[in-house]
Regions:
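C-terminal motif of bacterial Sec signal peptides marking the signal peptidase cleavage site
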Residues: 15-18
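Short, charge-rich amphipathic alpha-helical segments embedded
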Residues: 44-79
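Alpha-helical linker/edge segments of TPR/alpha-solenoid repeat scaffolds
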Residues: 71-101, 112-113
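An ectodomain-focused feature that recognizes extracytoplasmic/extracellular
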Residues: 94-156
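Mid-length scaffold segments of soluble, non-membrane domains
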Residues: 142-182
Length: 266
């Protein structure tokens, strides 16, 4: 009885070993294709082959171990390639932003502001006391807005409309409730409006533009050619700063990925 049990156990062991060997043989071509794809810089195809091994041959432990090691190399190479590309784009965006920023006034009080703002020098507050005007501006992250300073009776503005001579127009929504400032000579209503580069394109496509604040009532606000030029300048800078901000975030994420896979490689 003991001999029979021994023979049965031995036979079972041989069967399992043969099965395991067969599974490894079946999985091996997928690993070979994954390695070849990686060598050809076809990272998506390499990952697809590795995923096939996991799905089709979960018990091909040796091949799966090799495939996992290869996957780490694929991910690491892919992340390093992407980071080099991102670094290059970031350098271009930052150089462009630096050039454009030099043409604008930078407003930041480090005592209580973490993020500064760029706008045309002609739109500085001290140059426009008791005036109604529009100030296109962007912060250091590329958040593009247009601030309306309206001197006069309350409007409660919720929309800023730019209208072309042909009647076409574009509306900008207020980002918050108007802020009211009063002094001995009158009242100023300040409202911030969300802007996009498309607004600058619309304005730039027409020789004259009418700017209107819309709220409880409507009121036109001065908008000259010099204001349109300032809008275009700020829009360009906002785009460059926004691109820089997004690329910096991508750069940081890729750095985290690289660190993660380098640690798993050890």
């Amino acid at each position: 009885m003991k001999i029979r049990h021994f023979i049965l156990t031995l036979a079972t062991g041989f069967t399992l070993a043969n099965c395991a060997e067969d599974v490894e043989k079946l999985a091996k071509p997928y690993l070979d294709r994954a390695q070849q794809s990686y060598a050809n810089n076809q990272y998506a195809l390499a990952k697809l082959q590795i995923d096939s091994i996991k799905q089709l041959y979960p018990k091909a432990f040796d091949t799966r171990t090799q495939a996992q090691a290869l996957l780490i190399e694929v991910e690491l190479t892919e992340a390093n390639t992407s980071k080099c590309y991102t670094d290059s784009l970031l350098a271009i965006a930052q150089e462009k932003a630096t050039t454009l920023a030099a043409t604008l006034y930078f407003d930041k009080d480090v005592r209580y502001q973490d993020i500064g703002t760029y706008y045309a020098s002609r739109h500085r507050t001290e140059k426009n006391v008791d005036k109604s005007y529009l100030r296109p501006q962007t912060d250091e992250r590329g958040v593009f807005t247009i601030t309306a300073f309206y001197r006069g009776r309350a409007i409660g503005a919720h929309t800023l409309r730019f209208t072309a001579p042909d009647g076409s127009y574009v509306d900008l929504p207020a980002t918050a409730e108007p802020y009211i400032m009063s002094d001995a000579t009158g009242r100023t209503e300040r409202t911030d409006f969300a802007a996009t580069p498309e607004v600058a394109h619309f304005v730039g496509a027409h020789t004259t533009i009418t700017a209107t604040l819309i709220g409880e009532r409507k009121a036109q606000i001065p908008f000259a050619k010099t204001d349109a030029q300032a809008l275009a300048q700020v829009a360009d800078l906002a785009s460059a700063l926004k691109a820089s901000t997004e690329l910096q975030a991508a750069q940081q994420e890729l750095t985290r990925r690289i660190t993660f896979y380098e640690q798993r490689r050890k």
